[in-house]
Amino acid sequence: MKDMRICFIGDSFVNGTGDEKMLGWAGRLCAEARQHGHDTTYYNLGIRRNTSTDILQRWSEVSLRQQPDCDNRIVLSCGVNDTTMENGAMRVDFETSLQNMRDLFARMQSSPGLVVGPPPVDDELQNQRIQTLSNAMQSEAKKAGLPFISLFDHLIQDSNYLAEIAQNDGAHPRSTGYDKIARLISDSGKWWF
């Protein structure tokens, strides 16, 4: 069996910001895979405040970690920062964000990939923008033949998750929230293990 190398690229939610265990959902998923005997190496390429534009510009970070003799995988998750308002406008307008997603999805075709949609935050208006973007991402991922997991649809209905982010910084969960995200991904039937 080849060594599996998984690049998780995205924003602060990929990074695990707010998690007291410093694992985030990516670390939890790979720790569980390792416990079940899967030889995995994971690279957390999550950066706080990164938008889809930022991620597209640094895509070479993924390529640097992929090796021809390995089973290379890619997990992309972003979107919340695109929908954040700054100076009266979204950080990345909707059409640019969608085009960035198409470009990112095209780059993911080199390896088995998975797209994890953005989670809700403690801001009703931003959640409307996140939901719109998440739905569009799901549609584009389907066109690209990539599995998509909607965190928003599940977590917006979870009062405990929403309370946790409200008590933290209004966006990021703590360990319990990252446990939930990891479980949603693991139980989706789209995660590889």
Model-derived features: where do they sit?
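Alpha-helical cap/lid subdomain in secreted, periplasmic
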Residues: 31, 38, 57-193
